[in-house]
């Protein structure tokens, strides 16, 4: 949302100084990108009030038109037959777009949204759908292991657990789930070749 509002202000400034006119460049219609802005807003789990709510409301209208080939293809692959809503953004589309960065190819999410080649987009969307299935499996596997360790320290004010070779792409999600389960801050450290990587989640 912040980036979008910056672009709106920049667009207005360039219009006022007649930059588009002088460069003979068509002024971009930023409204067309509200589907992506609203998707990011929902997936960032920010409160849907004020400007955020307005952005998501208009973004859903843009998403309904399915102008973005990547989102359209992903919607079809996911079998969304109704008008996409906030649930679809946060729990169906968002996780698949993010899955590439968690267990597959980190560039897949961005490539899905900017590619206009139907064949390539379908391939990327299909792979993201598969990555998401792998992510779910890994998440549950790691969650089971970490929950056992977390239960040993559940009386501590902050739950800190560490283990070897827990998939770093899912420890953030697991930390969030354990934070909700125990209502305490959670820090998860995965160690691979003596190098530890951590993810932390805290309560409000």
Question: What do these predicted ranges mean?
Answer:
Residues 12-204:
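Hydrophobic helix-and-loop "lid/oligomerization" segment in the mid-to-C-terminal part
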